[in-house]
Amino acid sequence: MHVDIYQIAASDTAIYPGAGDCDSIEGLSYVTMGLVGEAGEIANKVKKILRDKDGVITQENRDDLQAELGDVMWYVAQLANQLDVWLSTVTQRNLNKLQSRKDRGVIQGSGDNR
């Protein structure tokens, strides 16, 4: 599925304060907090694999993480909507940035403006 098609389809299920209003700090805040929450759920599941399963990843773990990754993707799509940008634009811009860093030999290191 193309990311922009996903973004459109996911927006049909977007029911939250400020949904669809690109000027709404309420909407932007809501989806940002949701994204962080879902990413935290992934981190927590991975932590428990390390703690409780000696780092052995089962198919059940993979399925659970895939479900959480879907939730992350939903919030990423809504964040893009709140910023009035297509996911394809975001992903292409990111790849361009990373390729530039690789070409210049600065892909490792730190800082946004390398």
Swiss-Prot record:
CDD domains assigned: NTP-PPase_u4
Coiled coil segments of this chain: none
Pfam family, one: MazG
Lineage: superkingdom: Viruses
Name the record gives this protein: Gene 37 protein
Organism: Mycobacterium phage L5
Gene from which the chain derives: 37
